[in-house]
Amino acid sequence: MAVASRKLGALVLVAVLCLSLPTGCLSSQQAAALFIFGDSVFDPGNNNHINTHVNFKANFWPYGQSYFSSPTGRFSDGRIIPDFIAEYASLPIIPAYLEPNNDFTHGANFASAGAGALIASHAGLAVGLQTQLRYFGDLVDHYRQNLGDIKSRQLLSDAVYLFSCGGNDYQSPYYPYTQEQYVDIVIGNMTNVIKGIYEKGGRKFGVVNVPLIGCWPGMRAKQPGNTCNTEVDELTRLHNQAFAKRLEQLEKQLEGFVYAKFDLSTAILNRMKNPSKYGFKEGESACCGSGPFGGNYDCGRIKEFGLCDNATEYFFFDPFHPNELASRQFAEMFWDGDSMVTQPYNLKALFEGKPSTKYLPNDEL
């Protein structure tokens, strides 16, 4: 009886310790953790907890209406890409880092709407990429304190790190630099953050390229005659070409560095040009927003604004963000797509620890 009491007491103590640690108790059998960095494409609600302009928040109706019981701060009618990636990886939804009392056992989401690689991009209105890296460093210290050096190193090396960044940097004037110089500065800052994560133990990276936003509803609404903004798309093309080369260089320079790069830009353009092929009725106008193409960024931000009857029919939920259905489609492609969309590996390969298997197009398998 005394032995049984001691065993029960030990179990209770372990349970109490697990509940008292923000990182919980890691099991050797659990799925790899997921850490997320970037902008509004990946923001789960971090901006709810900073002092910023209403344009950088989405914690009000009708955001979240298609899935969540109340708005969460996601710039969507429902879930976003990281939510689906977590599901496919057998993980719970990864929590916002700035939300109080969250459990970071399975990772953390640092993404912030409006964030850029450059400190000047929406400074004071978003959590920039360098600050996100600093928050990650604080969490790494916490893991080491609670798990010890060996377990924390294992967690960090097994984890996958998602990135969506750069788009906000190209919506501001780049003078006095040339386009090439400006792109090089942006990519240099992104590279420094990736290397910073690598130095703390990260090895597996999932990145999306920057979408061509020049013809999006929110951009056309700002243009004379509601035309497309070709200059921002020129910069974005230069960025995507240069960043692809930089990732190849990092793979050669950094031992153990592997990555999955998803061509989000092409996936979006395909749905804008041929929405019915992908299950949408409208590919150019936003469900939520007033004015031409629903491009005025007033969704939920003023008393009267345009709102469609069925958000799933519109590729764009608001003037700058796709709906939940589109995010699910993108996540599926990112997760197990072939090399036509995700190179040189897909996320499934990274999570399963099989980065030695490269994926060929379906017609070459």
Curated annotation (Swiss-Prot):
This is GDSL lipase. GO terms for biological process: isoprenoid biosynthetic process; lipid catabolic process; response to wounding. It is found in: Secreted, Extracellular space. It comes from the Eukaryota. Keywords: Glycoprotein, Hydrolase, Lipid degradation, Lipid metabolism, Secreted, Signal. Pathway: Isoprenoid biosynthesis. The active site is at S40, D318, H321. Component of the monoterpenoid pyrethrins biosynthesis; pyrethrins are widely used plant-derived pesticide. Acyltransferase that catalyzes the esterification of terpene acids and lipid alcohol substrates into pyrethrins; mediates the transfer of a chrysanthemoyl moiety from the coenzyme A (CoA) thio-ester chrysanthemoyl CoA to pyrethrolone, and, to a lower extent, to jasmololone and cinerolone thus producing pyrethrins (e.g. pyrethrin type I). Can also use pyrethroyl CoA as substrate. Residues 1-27 form the signal peptide. Induction: By wounding. InterPro entries: GDSL, GLIP1-5/GLL25, SGNH_hydro_sf, SGNH_plant_lipase-like. The lineage of its organism: Eukaryota, Viridiplantae, Streptophyta, Embryophyta, Tracheophyta. It catalyses: (Z,S)-pyrethrolone + (1R,3R)-chrysanthemoyl-CoA = pyrethrin I + CoA; (Z,S)-pyrethrolone + (1R,3R)-pyrethroyl-CoA = pyrethrin II + CoA; (Z,S)-jasmololone + (1R,3R)-chrysanthemoyl-CoA = jasmolin I + CoA; (Z,S)-cinerolone + (1R,3R)-chrysanthemoyl-CoA = cinerin I + CoA. Pfam families: Lipase_GDSL. Glycans are attached at N189, N310.
